[in-house]
Design a protein with these regions (language model features):
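Extreme N-terminal starter segment of soluble prokaryotic enzymes
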Residues: 2-5
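Acetyl-CoA-dependent GNAT
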Residues: 8-14, 18-97, 107-109, 113, ...
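Active-site-proximal loop/turn and secondary-structure-junction residues that shape catalytic pockets
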Residues: 92, 128-130
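Conserved catalytic-core motifs of GNAT/GCN5-like acyltransferases
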Residues: 123-127, 137, 142-159
């Protein structure tokens, strides 16, 4: 069995982060939202400019590696609401590598970052129909609320807000 490695991402990793997103989103969201909405959201969240802005705002990205291959990433940041918590903004693993322990390793890294900063919880948003919802429940997250967020062009994010307290 191979161990999953985690490394900090750099600004120069934007194309890698975009590439992993482009390979994970169709299988993650293709049964939930249209291809047009997937394309819109990928451009909105994973363009070079958008990712550069996220790095600039203090989002910390980490890359998961297995056998020397980059297989996923996560992003964690201090909460914008100033509630003394952190937000897991993104966590994606290539479809053929899921259930390898990489998602858990990235989640543990995000928790480590939040705890080291003095936060008492980690929260996230997950689409109501995303299989990752069950993953987060198994890891101890609690569904806190749900909301439908207008992201423009007639598209919505229909999410649960989940929180892990520590």
């Amino acid at each position: 069995m191979s161990l999953v490695g985690i490394r900090p991402a750099k600004l120069e990793d934007r194309s890698l982060i975009r590439s992993i997103s482009e390979r994970t989103w169709p299988s993650t969201y293709g049964h939930i939202i249209s291809k047009e909405q997937i394309d819109f959201m990928l451009d909105w969240m994973y363009s070079d400019e958008s990712l550069a802005g996220q790095f600039e705002k203090g989002h910390q990205f980490f890359i998961a590696q297995l056998n020397g291959n980059d297989i996923g990433f996560c992003s964690v940041s201090k909460s914008d609401e100033g509630q003394g918590d952190h937000k897991l903004n993104k966590l994606y693993i290539l479809p053929n590598i899921q259930k390898s322990g990489a998602g858990t390793a990235l989640l543990f890294k995000a928790i480590e970052i939040a705890k080291a900063a003095g936060s008492t919880s980690l929260f996230l948003q997950v689409n109501k129909h995303n299989n990752a919802y069950e993953f987060y429940l198994k890891k101890g997250f609690i569904k806190e609320s749900e909301f439908k967020f207008d992201i423009g062009n007639g598209y919505y994010m229909d999410d649960y807000v989940m929180r892990l307290s520590f």
